[in-house]
Amino acid sequence: METNVVLAVLFWGCLLLGMPEGRGQEAEWRKGTYSDGTLRYEGYFRAGKPAGEMKRYYPDGKLQARMVYRGDTVEAVLYSRKSDCSMRGKYVVRNKQGTWEYFKNDCLLMKEEYRDQVLNGKTVRFFSTGNPAEEKDWVNGKPEGEWKLY
């Protein structure tokens, strides 16, 4: 009897962990298409809203964005049409939040800090070698302090 209870608990735990956000609510896998039938997006939805991983595609079929939805937070990786990573960061209630990184050909170009969609913190631009090219601090969207050029 104890073995059956343990197996049942493990089984249900695995099922819940396998669901997006692990809340036990039913999630539906959906795909959307452009008017020509090309895949536009694919991902899980719960109560009509994205939940868990979602991918968006350009009309030519290349990956445009990979996002992971958790409540009001979205971790996003956005790609250029060339399919190299262009930017990576987090949205909270549709506002940029925290560190955002910008790339070109897999080379880090810049890091910025956001609070509620507004620059707050340090912005660092990089040379193609990876060394800092410039640094600037921001408070509520306005530059503050020294602007360091290297």
Model-assigned labels for residue ranges:
Residues 18-150:
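Glycine/tyrosine- and acidic-biased, solvent-exposed loop/turn segments at the edges of beta-strands
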Residues 7-18:
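Bacterial N-terminal signal peptides
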